[in-house]
């Protein structure tokens, strides 16, 4: 069960799509429940206008979190969770299934070996695939919900978007279906670079641990080791594409002006950010984003490997072999 081959243990085929669906969906759901509050803080920091006021220090991630809880209760940290949970199962199913498919296409036809370049390209393609299929529409709805500053403790403080389904319906009704794909190019670029870095780092670290621990060369690593390398691999992506994520968030939060193209909107947003807030604005929310993504990947890989192993050992008809990271 080497990390750098598509061949499963004892010559079996890789895990079936059903295994990826169940294990990936379960892992993604756990990731969302554990890490969503940090994502809400990240979005609020990226949308904050405090940095535009002269002499006003931008609020940090801890202060932002405290402010949300104080004004909106702790449940305010989970705004948009419904949209995330609604898309997490297909997102993870598409991520792992498409990554495995692309990896098989790029593997050596005779030996099944997968190079680091092939791993990077497979991760890149998987990230773009999930962005177009699931992530962008989900994030448009999520960001609209997270951007609302109403208090969940006050029943008279009625928000525009009451839930994820209501937000989805309202956005489509008022702004059109195409709004769900606003910023899709940036989302695809972000997800592609994220998964390219994520899968490459995870695979290389897993291969290294298997080399120095021969007893795990053809089996799963201990869960604590999977968690550790998942944490490291998850921290790589955010630093490489933070400006993309910040611009994307602002693009998806606001309405489009009539006749304005996506490219021109991106340029206007980037120009205004730099002019009014400086270069640091492009890295707004980087701390909570790393704190959100890195633990999220640690949870995802750990839970995924655990569930996948259980499913494969259960003897279900779903099993097609061992999925390789």
Curated annotation (Swiss-Prot):
Mind telling me which GO cellular component terms the entry cites?
A: mitochondrial inner membrane
Leader sequence range is none
Keyword field contains Plastid: no
List localization entries. Answer: Mitochondrion inner membrane
Q: Does the keyword Translocase apply?
A: yes
Paired cysteines (S-S): none
For this protein, the parts annotated as crossing the membrane are 21-41, 82-102, 121-141, 187-207, 221-241, 282-303
Using the UniProt record, give the first listed, main subcellular location: mitochondrion
Keyword list, A-Z: Membrane, Mitochondrion, Mitochondrion inner membrane, Repeat, Translocase, Transmembrane, Transmembrane helix, Transport
Q: What class of enzyme is it?
A: translocase
- For this protein, what is the EC number? 7.-.-.-
Q: Which InterPro entries does its entry note?
A: Mit_carrier, Mitochondrial_sb/sol_carrier, Mt_carrier_dom_sf, TXTP-like
In Pfam terms, one family for this protein is: Mito_carr
The record ties this protein, via Gene3D superfamilies, to:
Mitochondrial carrier domain
Q: Which domain of life is it from?
A: Eukaryota
The record's statement on gene disruption is: Leads to fluffy and albino colonies, and reduced conidia formation, when all 6 genes ctpA to ctpF are deleted.
> Its membrane topology, per UniProt?
Multi-pass membrane protein
Q: Where are the Solcar repeats?
A: 15-105, 117-208, 221-310
One Gene Ontology term of the molecular function aspect:
succinate:fumarate antiporter activity
**Protein family (similarity comment):** Belongs to the mitochondrial carrier (TC 2.A.29) family.
- Say what the protein does: Mitochondrial transporter that does not mediate citrate export from mitochondria to cytoplasm. Its exact function has still to be determined.
Protein name, UniProt field: Mitochondrial citrate transporter C
What is the organism of origin for this protein?
Aspergillus niger (strain ATCC 1015 / CBS 113.46 / FGSC A1144 / LSHB Ac4 / NCTC 3858a / NRRL 328 / USDA 3528.7)
From the UniProt record, report the name of the gene that encodes this protein.
ctpC
